[in-house]
Amino acid sequence: MPLDLYNTLTRRKERFEPMTPDRVGMYVCGPTVYDTAHIGNARPVVFDLLFRLLRRLYPAVTYVRNITASDDKIIDRRATTGADRGADQAHRGPLPRRHGPLNAAPTIEPRATHHISHMVALIGLLIEPATPTPRKGTCCSPCRRWRSTGQLSRRSLDEMIAGARVEVAPYKRDSSDFVLWKPSTDGQPGWDSPWGRGRPGWHIECSAMAKEHLGVTFDIHGGGLDLILPDHENEIAQSRCAHAGEPLARYWVHQRLRDRRGARRMSKSLGNLLHRGTSCWTEFPGGGHPLGVRPYRSRGLPEAEESKATLDRWYQALRGDPAPAQAELPFDVLAALEDDLNSPLAISHLHELASAVNKATGEAEKAAAKGRCRSAERWAAPETRSVVPLGAEGAAALSDADIQQRIEDRSAARKAKNYAEADRIRKELADLGIVLEDGPQGTTWKRA
């Protein structure tokens, strides 16, 4: 079956057809690393699911997910906390580890600070020779140069700025303009440019990095629903202005947001975070369509727990002597995923596969059923990793040295009276099937 995706650009589900038949490029907006990762940051696992599906369907797939390491929020956090410029690395550090259990790794993960020259070059295409010298070293992009601004959000420029009640900055010629390059003070990070020492505006980062790694136009651009306006609108505007109207991406896919207490989206800027730690299962894409705002329920988490229980049964069914995998992914699972990533339906089919193993009576029947399960496992984890380490399977993925290092980290946290961090590490190991026992001689561990 062909792949169908909901395209925010057209507001309908469309047949996916890549620009090049055997090659797909996908860019997804990653985190801004000014605070610890929270459970909402795990939602992009939806794009990992799409990445795996695309790799099954096409010979070559490039998945780019950026890291924003130079941003006003990062600068403000440093000023507030007194942290140095390495602080973003501390917040970025947990991301690979915490995404590790989710097994959600992109092909390329560029950092904004490593692409300043590309941003300067792109801004140079937007600043026309006849444009007056930028005021106070600030370059702005005139949105009205591109008439289709608003095509993602379905809002006109006048609607976007109507009622804003915000005074227009003196360096802007129009209230709809957005910053491409801004000056930096002595205490702020900055780079040399034709417009003086400064740093890039937020939106130019993704346009420049996507162009560098995927080209002027690529297949899929992903991100959260909250990025449609103004982030993705501005990316489209500046990219099309810079490249004679060429589109930035052909398909725009937006994942749902995590909403806390049924009120607002969960985000660092709103200060309503629940840090992920080991809450990976609240984000498993088995609880509904990737579009929309998903409420976080602190008690029960029935959808996530049901998904986890299903895959627990799946792994349990595969324990013992390994059975050879079938060549193809079971049709029902594949068909569900090809229908706009219908992960709830795919999960239900995985449950059926595991049930078939448990219900099989003869050795031949059981081997055939296990083979169908193995095909799903190997498709989902082509690098010979499990989809998500669970229980004993997760423990097996950790070496003794890894476990001992986490125990030492926990001991250091306890000595520093950082009991929340110590408890988090203990819970993290417990979720991976590692049981810790504290005694007079120190901490010992065993695999559950």
Swiss-Prot record:
One of its GO terms (molecular function) is ATP binding. Residues 79-106 are annotated as: Disordered. ATP binds at K268. It is an enzyme of class 6 (ligase). It is found in: Cytoplasm. Transmembrane segments: none annotated. GO terms for cellular component: cytosol. A motif ('KMSKS' region) lies at residues 265-269. PANTHER family: CYSTEINE--TRNA LIGASE, CYTOPLASMIC, CYSTEINYL-TRNA SYNTHETASE. Monomer. This is Cysteine--tRNA ligase. The lineage of its organism: Bacteria, Pseudomonadati, Pseudomonadota, Alphaproteobacteria, Rhodospirillales.
